[in-house]
Amino acid sequence: MLTKKQLQLLEFIHKRLQKDGVPPSFDEMKTALDLRSKSGIHRLITALEERGFIRRLAHRARAIEVIRLPDSLGGGGALGAASDGFQPKVIAGGRGDSADGGAAAELKPVADTGATELTIMGRIAAGVPIEAINQAAAHVAVPNAMLSSSGQHYALEVRGDSMIDAGINDGDVVVIRETDAADNGDIVVALVEGHEATLKRFERKGRMIELHAANPAYPTRSYTEDQVKVQGRLVGLIRTY
């Protein structure tokens, strides 16, 4: 049986994974549970892992997968593929063959695997913005459960460490659903001033847009609405070991 705090934390992690595709940071967990220190979060996570509700992925800061939910959260067993919307997970996988330069993003079903081949359209900065994505580089197989039934999807290789507290490291491949709209808290691909692309957490404040890193070493950057164009929202993460 879980304590009240353990249940609250499990529900918070599960909802964030459903929404963003990545787990919350320890600071976000601490704030959500109204705790004074991160050590309390560490103890709660350890307890949830020991009871078989979550799994921490090795060699990765704050990479957490929810394995099952208790009956009180609508669980009762191991989590499978999502039914209404995606059940985001960190997928350990490999890269496909290189794509032809300049190819457009496309979806290619991978026979008998329950996966779809996405084009990796280039590299995205998780740090200081870099030049905008310009051409396809390779392909990657993405589980169909990670993709929504509507909208176009593409993949990008992450460069930089500004999103490490959101569980996104240098070298990861992020799966993006193409959209020009975002809600506060979404992790998005943002095109800054028409030529620099970056992966950040989105927040609108009046007529200004703030792009937040998930690493205290990087400052929050503020722009006017006409300086930032949302090009997609994070829906999943693929990691090669």
From Swiss-Prot:
Q: Which Pfam families match?
A: LexA_DNA_bind, Peptidase_S24
Q: What is catalyzed by this enzyme?
A: Hydrolysis of Ala-|-Gly bond in repressor LexA
Question: CDD domains from the entry?
Answer: S24_LexA-like
Molecular functions (GO terms): DNA binding; serine-type endopeptidase activity
Record keyword Nucleus present: no
Annotated InterPro entries: LexA (IPR006200), LexA-like (IPR039418), LexA/Signal_pep-like_sf (IPR036286), LexA_DNA-bd_dom (IPR006199), LexA_repressor (IPR050077), Peptidase_S24_LexA (IPR006197), Peptidase_S24_S26A/B/C (IPR015927), WH-like_DNA-bd_sf (IPR036388)
What residues does the record give for site: Cleavage?
Answer: 126-127
Q: Do you know which PANTHER family this protein is assigned to?
A: LEXA REPRESSOR, LEXA REPRESSOR-RELATED
User: Subunit arrangement?
Assistant: Homodimer.
Name of the protein this chain belongs to: LexA repressor
Q: What are the leading ranks of the lineage?
A: Bacteria, Pseudomonadati, Pseudomonadota, Alphaproteobacteria, Rhodobacterales
Gene symbol? lexA
